[in-house]
Structures are given as C-alpha cells and as structure tokens.
C-alpha cells in the first residue's frame, strides 16, 4: 500500500518534469515491485554474513601488521631507515 503510493508520487513527478521540459528522470526503476504492482520475492540472504566479514578482515589486518613489522625491522637492521632521536620532543 505504502509502496504503491510512493510509486504513484514518483510517476507524477516524472510526468510533471517531462511536461516542463526537464528530462532529469527518464526511467523509473522498480526495485521492489513488478510493473503489475506485485511484490518481488525476497533476495537470498547469506547466513553468517557478518561473521564471514569478521573472519576475513581480522586475519587480513594481522597479516598486514606482521608484514609491516618485518619490513620495518629489515629497514632498520640494514640502516636504510633509522628513526632519529632528535624528532622526539616528549620532554
């Protein structure tokens, strides 16, 4: 009921825009309903989606931190980049 009201309002705005010469809205994309007004079926929901994201992001962060730490140690051991103590103004 509410969705059909929204579709009607958009159609009115679309027709009003074309009458005044505005071609901003060319096509109405219906995400939730078919042209007949029937509701589309619910999309497939992946179970444990948030858990999958967490199980993907956390190992990626840990691996990235390990690689960064190893690279920093390598650069410091080979004297390619040694942080100077003059930059520390924590007195």
Curated annotation (Swiss-Prot):
Keywords: Calcium, Calcium transport, Ion transport, Membrane, Mitochondrion, Mitochondrion inner membrane, Transit peptide, Transmembrane, Transmembrane helix, Transport. It is found in: Mitochondrion inner membrane. Belongs to the SMDT1/EMRE family. It is a single-pass membrane protein. GO terms for biological process: calcium import into the mitochondrion; mitochondrial calcium ion homeostasis. Essential regulatory subunit of the mitochondrial calcium uniporter (mcu) channel, a protein that mediates calcium uptake into mitochondria. GO terms for cellular component: uniplex complex. It comes from Aedes aegypti (Yellowfever mosquito). The keyword Transport applies. This is Essential MCU regulator, mitochondrial. The chain crosses the membrane at residues 45-65. Its main location: mitochondrion.
